[in-house]
Amino acid sequence: MSEPTKAPAASAGSRAATKKELPEHFKAYKHVWVFIEQERGQVHPVSWELMGAGRKLADKLKVELAAIVLGPDDEATQHAAAEAFSYGADLTYVVADPLLTDYRNEAYTKALTDVVNTYKPEILLLGATTLGRDLAGSVATTLLTGLTADCTELDVDADGSLAATRPTFGGSLLCTIYTLNYRPQMATVRPRVMPMPEREEKPIGRIITHPLGMVEDDIVTKILSFLPDRDSAKSNLAYADVVVAGGLGLGSPENFQLVRQLAGVLGAEYGCSRPLVQKGWVTSDRQIGQTGKTIRPKLYIAAGISGAIQHRVGVEGADMIVAINTDKNAPIFDFAHVGIVTDAIRLLPALTEAFRARLSPHSRDRIAS
């Protein structure tokens, strides 16, 4: 079976050779924090996914889990702060200021680093989104600490250090990285890598507010206008319940339309493997895998996809994987729940017609919801 090899984690003894005694001021750093990403009043779902992961880390360390919310002083920011308790937060830190209405690196970096320096978290987690990646890098640089990006697994070892695992060497190796001598220990995680925790209605707990300590003249970046994305065809691939995807085994861009047709009948999103994006058959926002989207659908149908390691890491969280491939030895059959050895070009139209005959439009909506 072809799967990424996990490099053996360094033993406590081998890490001791590189681990210095933590400076006295770092010993005061406790608790796990999750940055709650919101834009225009909408919280990115990866924030709640990270709350679930953060809750597990905090429980292992026997410390508190805190959310950190930055935004304008409005109802949406206060709602995000309160909602964090429903996803496991013990307390929430809030920096609310008109200067934080739209994301600007200078203001957000100042706000987050000030709160970190004041309240001293041991672990700080952010989503590996466009905003999160930009912010995490500048915050880690400002704090002079380490950052592990695009993690696929988070844990704490026997010493209580964050063990952040991520793919490396083109996805052929999983490497566990430690920040041994600095605090906070920072990591980013892509959307849908971690499962969404169950939301539980809970009373609002402690909310601690902190001032921004910045004025408009301190910020080089200026917001001239805001133009919302009006691309109605933009994919919601990462959060779709049903996904149909195609790979090189389909042979041509014309045959890829068979994937789109089946997805349309099922009320599903469609995606592809990396080679199709490289060939220009499909746009990059539809790519699934290590360098594309990570998905966790209830049903994933993969047609003509070999299932290389880089693709596997993006789909193995799916509840049900149905693989269609002419090669019975294709790696995708090692992790698919259902494998069909046949030509996808012949099977896809038959599936489309069968589902079209059996499913009313109402039924298709129900499958995709």
From Swiss-Prot:
Q: Which GO terms describe its molecular function?
A: electron transfer activity; flavin adenine dinucleotide binding
Which Pfam families would you find in this protein's record? ETF (PF01012), ETF_alpha (PF00766)
* Biological-process GO terms, alphabetical: fatty acid beta-oxidation using acyl-CoA dehydrogenase; nitrogen fixation
Q: Extract the CDD domains matched here.
A: ETF_alpha (cd01715)
Q: Which InterPro entries match?
A: DHS-like_NAD/FAD-binding_dom, ETF_a/b_N, ETF_a/FixB, ETF_alpha_N, ETF_asu_C, ETF_asu_C_CS, Rossmann-like_a/b/a_fold
Q: Which domain of life is it from?
A: Bacteria
Q: Where does FAD bind?
A: 299-327
What's this protein's family per the entry?
A: Belongs to the ETF alpha-subunit/FixB family.
Give the matching PANTHER family: ELECTRON TRANSFER FLAVOPROTEIN ALPHA (PTHR43153), ELECTRON TRANSFER FLAVOPROTEIN SUBUNIT ALPHA, MITOCHONDRIAL (PTHR43153:SF1)
The protein's name = Protein FixB
